[in-house]
Amino acid sequence: MEVNDWQAVNEYASDPEVVRYMDWGPNTEKETKEFIQRAMSTRNEKPRRMYTLAIVVEQEDRLIGSCGINVSNPENREGWLGYCLNRNFWGKGYGTEVARGLMDFGFTELALHRIFATCDPGNTASAHVLEKSGMKREGCLREHKWSKGKWRDSYLYAILEHEWKPHKK
């Protein structure tokens, strides 16, 4: 992700429907530019624990979203992943492709043992992406986050390294 990507990022980050289940947004232009700066600043951290990436449709050379994987607990080799897509690209398999790519990177390059993700119980599309990607729903975190003026539940999904290897084939 680069500074000049801010308009493409802001196209989805400022869309109330896209960010409906997110902890953030809808973004202003300033907030989107700050997000990109934060994402870029983590590239040089040693050790690097955050990887925020642009989702690009290569055939169109178009940025359609962002995703990331973060090493949340290095001692236990645990990380979490997330993604956000421009709604014009929902339902086309990009979310599943991105989630699987992040898992592959997490297990092969970052040597993680466990990768998890959360989603709002109302976000059935994201739950479907996580399940289709090979994650299992482990439970519901009840009122575990304060977001947009209210306590919200999250479904917790995870996959273990030994579960990924056969799933990847």
At which residue positions do the language-model features occur?
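Short loop/turn motifs at secondary-structure junctions and domain boundaries
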Residues: R43-R49, M135
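A short hydrophobic/aromatic micro-motif that marks alpha-helical segments and, especially, helix-coil
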Residues: E29-K30, R43, W164-K165
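Conserved GNAT-fold acetyl-CoA-binding loop/helix
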Residues: E17-M40, L53
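A short glycine-rich, hydrophobically flanked beta-strand micro-motif that places a catalytic Asp/Glu
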Residues: R49-I55
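Acyl-donor (CoA/ACP) binding surface of acyl/acetyltransferases
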Residues: M1-E17, V56-K169
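Short helix-to-loop capping/linker segments positioned immediately adjacent to catalytic or ligand/cofactor-binding
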Residues: R20, T42-N44, G91
